[in-house]
A protein has these predicted regions:
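Conformationally flexible catalytic loops at phosphate/diphosphate-handling active centers
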Residues: 6, 30, 41, 140-197
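Glycine-rich, anion-gripping cofactor-binding loops and their flanking helix/strand elements
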Residues: 60, 64, 75-76, 82, ...
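Phosphate/pyrophosphate-binding active-site segments
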Residues: 1-4, 165, 267-270, 274-367, ...
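Structural signature of the thiamine diphosphate
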Residues: 19-22, 64-76, 80-82, 89-101, ...
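Structural motif
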Residues: 26-28, 75-76, 133-135, 151-154, ...
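Thiamine diphosphate
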Residues: 89-90, 100, 106-120, 376-542
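N-terminal cofactor/phosphate-binding cores enriched in small/glycine residues
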Residues: 3-73, 81, 375
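Active-site diphosphate/adenylate-binding microenvironment
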Residues: 9-13, 26-30, 34-35, 323-417
Length: 542
C-alpha cells in the first residue's frame, strides 16, 4: 500500500522536530501537506515567507546564530532553484541548513507537467539529495551533513479532509546556540607543533576560534573572528611584507626586521589583499588551522590545535604594536580629512562607535565588512556575522532579519529585544529588499537597525582596477550603476521606520537616538559619496 502524502508529511515533520527548532515555510500547492503538518507542530517555530530566495537566506541568518540546522520548505519547480544561492553560501561557510522541497511523483518527470523539474541532484557538489517517496525513506533520513536536501515526492490528494491534530510539546525549553546531537561534529585535523620564539603572526578570518596556546600572539583578525588580546590593524600588513622598516614608537625611532618568520592562519580570511599576499611570501612558513575539511591557501603544515612552545619576543610584540598603531592612525587621519567628504568608511566608524556589549552586528560582504575592519573590529562582546563563504552580497537583509530573530529568541523574558545592527551598502540593500517583506502575523525583529551606506551605486568598484582613469569611460554604466532609488519610500512600503543622515554628525545622533528608543525595524540611510573612495583607498595604503 502506498503511503499517503499526509502520512509522509507528518513523518517529515517528526524528523524535523528532532533535528531543528526553526522552519521557514513558503506557500505552495505541492508542499501543502508539509505546511499542514509543520503548522500543527507546537515544538517548531515556523516563519512564513513568500519568496523562496529570501526564505532560504532568512534560514541561513537564523542558522548562523544558532549554529545548527534551520529548515526551509517550499513547493516544486523553480521555487527550489531559488534556494541555490543560500545553499552555496551555507556550503562555503560550513553553516548548517536543510532545504525541504516538495516534488511531483516520478511518473510526472519529463511529461511537461507544471512546476516539474529534475530536483534530485539540483545542488550538485554543494549538497546531496535525499529523496523521499515513502515512510521508509523518511526513517532513513540523515542530518549528518552540514547541508541537507530532502526532496519529498507528494501525490494527490494534497489537502486533508480535516486539519491534523496538534503535535509536540509547546513547553519545550529554548535551545541555546550550539549544534544538536544529530548535527555533524567539527573535523579534528590533530595538533601541529609551533615554536612561538620565532616571530609569529596569526591571521584570523571567518570561522576562526580562540585557539589555546595562541592567546598572546599578535593577530590580524577580521570582524567575524574572535577579538584577540594583541590585535593588529590590517593596514600593518604593508610592514610585514618588508624585511626591514623604520618605525617610530614610544618617542623613539628605530629600524626593525618586520617580516614574520611564520604565519598561523585560523579559519577562512578573505578581506584584505595585502594581508592575503603574506601567505604567498616564500620566506614565511604558513601553518593552517581549521575545524572543517577546508584550509585557506596552501599551508605547509595543518592541524586543528597547536602544541605551542616558547613565548613571543618582547621586541616582536613591540614591532607588531607599533605597526598596528600606524595603521589605526592612518584611518583616523583619513576620517578627519574633510577632503574625503562623508564616505562608507565614516559610516562604519560611526556604527562601530555605538556598538555595545551584547549587540549583534551583520555586515554586508562588499565595502562594509572591509570598512568595519579598518574601523577596528572585532570588538569584545559583539557577535559579528558576514557572508564570507562565497562572499556575495546575496540575501543580506534576510540574513540580518534571521539573525535578529535568533538573538531575541534567546532572550524571551527581556522587555527589550537585544540590539542587532546591519551595515549594508545600497546595492546589497536593494538586492534583497524582499528580506523586509514579513507578513502581519509573523514574528518580526524587535530591535533591528539597518544602516544603508548609500553612495548610489557600486562603491567598491571605485577602489578596484576597473575604477582606474585609464579604463573609466564606461565605468558608471557597467560598474558604478547609479540607481536613484528612493530608500525612504521603500522603507515606507515595507512599514519600517526610516531616518536619513546627510552628515557624520547626523548619523552619530541618529544611532544614539535609535539605540535609546528602538523601533522593531529601522532603516537609517546615510547619504555618502563614492567620488573620493579611490583616493581614500590610496591614502590608506600609504
Amino acid at each position: 500500500m502506498t503511503d499517503s502524502s499526509f502520512d509522509i508529511a507528518t513523518a517529515i515533520a517528526d524528523v524535523l522536530a528532532r533535528n531543528v527548532t526553526d522552519v521557514v515555510l513558503c506557500p505552495g500547492s505541492r508542499n501543502s501537506p508539509l505546511a499542514y503538518a509543520l503548522l500543527a507542530r507546537e515544538d517548531l517555530c515556523v516563519h512564513v515567507r513568500i519568496d523562496e530566495r529570501s526564505a532560504a537566506f532568512t534560514a541561513l541568518g537564523l542558522a548562523r546564530v544558532q549554529r545548527r540546522h534551520v529548515a526551509v520548505v517550499m513547493t516544486s519547480g523553480t521555487a527550489v532553484a531559488n534556494t541555490m544561492p543560500a545553499m552555496v553560501e551555507a556550503h562555503m561557510s560550513h553553516t548548517p541548513i536543510a532545504v525541504v522541497s516538495a516534488d511531483r511523483p516520478s511518473r510526472m518527470l519529463g511529461t511537461g507537467a507544471s512546476q516539474t523539474i529534475w530536483q534530485q541532484g539540483l545542488f550538485g557538489r554543494y549538497c546531496t539529495t535525499q529523496h523521499v517517496e515513502s515512510i521508509a525513506d523518511v526513517e532513513a533520513l540523515s542530518f549528518a551533513a552540514d547541508q541537507v536536501h530532502i526532496n519529498v515526492a507528494l501525490d494527490t490528494p494534497l489537502v486533508p479532509e480535516e486539519l491534523p491534530r496538534r503535535a509536540g510539546q509547546a513547553e519545550r525549553a529554548p535551545v541555546g546556540p550550539g549544534r544538536l546531537d544529530t548535527a555533524p561534529a567539527w573535523v579534528d585535523h590533530g595538533s601541529v607543533d609551533v615554536d612561538l620564539e620565532r616571530d609569529t603572526l596569526v591571521i584570523a578570518g571567518d570561522e576562526a576560534w580562540d585557539v589555546p596556546g595562541l592567546e598572546y600572539v599578535p593577530t590580524i583578525a577580521e570582524p567575524t573572528a574572535p577579538t584577540p588580546f594583541h590585535q593588529v590593524h590590517p593596514l600593518a600588513a604593508r610592514f610585514f611584507v618588508q624585511s626591514e622598516v623604520a618605525i617610530s614608537h614610544d618617542g623613539g625611532d628605530f629600524s626593525a626586521s618586520t617580516k614574520p618568520e611564520q604565519i598561523i592562519v585560523v579559519g577562512h580570511p578573505t578581506l584584505h589583499r595585502e594581508v592575503m599576499s603574506l601567505l604567498e611570501d616564500p620566506d614565511i612558513e604558513v601553518i593552517g588551522l581549521s575545524r572543517t575539511e577546508t584550509f585557506t591557501g596552501h599551508p605547509t603544515r595543518t592541524g586543528s590545535r597547536v602544541n605551542a612552545t616558547g613565548q613571543p619576543r618582547d621586541s616582536w610584540l613591540k614591532i607588531c604594536e607599533a605597526a598596528g598603531e600606524v595603521g589605526a592612525q592612518t584611518v583616523r587621519d583619513a576620517l578627519a580629512d574633510a577632503a574625503f567628504g562623508f564616505t562608507g568608511l565614516h559610516v562604519a566608524a560611526a556604527v562601530a562607535d555605538t556598538l555595545g556589549v551584547g549587540d549583534t552586528l551583520v555586515l554586508g560582504a562588499s565595502n562594509p565588512v572591509r570598512d568595519a575592519s579598518y574601523a577596528g573590529l572585532p570588538f569584545d562582546g559583539v557577535a559579528t556575522y558576514s557572508a564570507r563563504g562565497a562572499a556575495g552580497i546575496d540575501g543580506t537583509v534576510s540574513q540580518a532579519v534571521g539573525a535578529a530573530l535568533a538573538v531575541q529568541a534567546l532572550h524571551p523574558d527581556e522587555i527589550r529585544a537585544p540590539r542587532t545592527v546591519a551595515l549594508l551598502g545600497d546595492l546589497t540593500f536593494l538586492h534583497d529588499i524582499n528580506g523586509l517583506l514579513i507578513g502581519p502575523g509573523e514574528r518580526r525583529p524587535g530591535n533591528l537597525t539597518i544602516v544603508v551606506a548609500n553612495d548610489d551605486g557600486g562603491g567598491i568598484f571605485e577602489t578596484l582596477e576597473v575604477g582606474a582613469d585609464s579604463v573609466r569611460e564606461d565605468f558608471e554604466r557597467a560598474f558604478g550603476t547609479p540607481h536613484g532609488v528612493d530608500v525612504e519610500r521603500l522603507a515606507g512600503a515595507h512599514d519600517v521606520a526610516y531616518h536619513r543622515a546627510e552628515t557624520l554628525t547626523e548619523l552619530q545622533e541618529l544611532l544614539v537616538e535609535t539605540t535609546a528608543n528602538p523601533e522593531p525595524v529601522t532603516v537609517i540611510e546615510a547619504r555618502t559619496t563614492r567620488a573620493t573612495r579611490r583616493e581614500l583607498a590610496q591614502r590608506l595604503k600609504k
